[in-house]
UniProtKB/Swiss-Prot annotation:
Species whose genome carries this gene: Arabidopsis thaliana (Mouse-ear cress)
PANTHER family: BNACNNG10540D PROTEIN, F-BOX PROTEIN CPR30-LIKE
A matching Pfam family: FBA_1
InterPro entries per UniProt: F-box-assoc_dom_typ1, F-box-assoc_interact_dom, F-box-like_dom_sf, F-box_dom, SCF_F-box_component
Protein name: F-box protein At1g11810
SUPFAM superfamilies, A to Z: F-box domain
Domain F-box: 2-48
């Protein structure tokens, strides 16, 4: 009896699918109906992401997007990485990455194009180029962005950005394919951090700085609710950040789209994970504290950037930011309990950005009535 792809055991198909790069999924889906159905169950339904020590995402090296798979195996061979440049983004120089609900939102640093924003579903092979309101506004990559969705049945995905022309905020709806101004504002003492917002359960969370007095400020967290299209209250952080400008590094990340994590680097490097989080309320638990000065062989100059929390292995993966005295090249560091740390290389230079990624069936197509097609899940 001849074995064909359609007659392979389900267990073997699932194992094959778990090893397929994100960017190859579209070609694989056309192999046979069984494989397409299995890919939806395996990748979208959660079998692949249920492997808690396997982390899939996209990393920005220079202005090029690369897919990355990171397996934390334990033992001597603790880290297994796979980094591959994504050819689909050739010619679209990227400056920022965002992920929400299986969609990847990219911002180009091509200031002379009227299309500097792109949303794509790598699993479905769909892409949406978003037109700016005017050519001048293509400079919006210097502004703060956020990506999320409202609580409607079919999840209308939206993009928030501050408007450098008017000084206010505007929002783009993927469903209507249009921009509109928002009647929202923040206190003059509150400033959104331009980079690094994350999406969690449809809402966006920003790092913000609140100015206490001249030269003195503190970090806070701020949620933008895409259903209400408004900001929430300032959310407290689990550490004391009051100080002079330039003191302390704060970064936020998501833990499997279930919780928010915050990193704070000052004399030590600390990680906390939310136990409860809503637009106007948050509580925290400590995950890890690392005294960098006690780590033998750790570089003298290190500024923490994006990070990944692995609760099963009780470790955190931290990508460094590039500095004038950068000696880390493209290294990332893994920190664990009892002073454990190791490093691995992800490229020739420190990554500019990173976002985790979970495939989904969210379509970017618009039907003849001008509405987005319903979710197929």
């Amino acid at each position: 009896m001849t074995t064909t792809m359609s007659t392979l055991p389900v267990v073997l198909v699932d194992e094959i699918l778990a090893r397929v790069p994100i960017t190859s999924l579209r070609s694989l889906r056309s192999t046979c109906k069984k494989w397409e159905a299995s890919s939806k169950t395996n990748l979208v339904g959660g079998k692949a992401t249920a492997r808690k020590s396997s982390h899939v995402g996209f990393i920005l090296i220079g202005d090029k997007i690369c897919s990355m798979k990171l397996d934390l195996n334990g033992g001597d061979d603790f880290v297994d990485t796979s980094v591959n440049q994504v050819s689909a983004f050739d010619g679209f120089a990227i400056s920022q990455l965002f992920h929400c609900d299986g969609l990847l939102f990219c911002i180009s640093n091509n200031h002379y194009s009227n299309y500097t924003l792109m949303v794509c579903n790598m699993y479905l092979g769909e892409t949406r180029l978003i037109q700016n309101r005017s050519l001048f506004e293509s400079y919006q990559n210097f502004c703060s962005y956020a990506f999320g969705y409202d609580s409607s049945k079919n999840r209308n995905h939206k993009i928030l950005r501050n408007n450098s022309v008017s000084g206010g905020y505007e929002i783009y709806s993927l469903k209507s394919d249009s921009w509109k101004d928002l009647n929202v504002d923040l206190e003059k003492s509150i400033h959104l951090w331009r980079l690094g917002s994350v999406s969690l359960k449809g809402n966006a969370y920003f790092r913000v700085i609140k100015v206490i007095e001249e030269g003195v400020w503190e970090y806070n967290l701020l949620c933008f609710d895409f259903t209400r299209e408004s900001f929430g209250k300032l959310l407290s952080l689990p550490f004391e950040s009051l100080g002079d400008e330039g003191e302390g590094i704060m970064v936020i990340s998501c833990v499997r789209d279930d919780h928010l994590a915050v990193l704070y680097q000052r004399d030590t490097l600390g990680i906390w994970i939310s136990t409860e989080i809503e637009p106007n309320k948050v509580s925290w638990r400590e995950f890890l504290q690392v005294d960098l000065a006690t780590l033998d062989g750790f570089p003298d100059v290190f500024i923490a950037g994006r990070f990944i929390v692995d609760e099963e292995k009780q470790v955190v993966v931290v990508f460094g930011q590039e500095t004038e005295l950068d000696l880390n090249h493209g290294n990332a560091f893994i920190f664990g309990r009892d002073g454990y740390f190791t490093s691995f290389t992800v490229g020739d230079a420190p990554p500019e950005d990173f976002t985790s990624y979970v495939p989904s069936l969210v379509s970017l197509q618009i039907d003849k009535t001008g509405k987005r097609k319903a979710r197929d899940d």
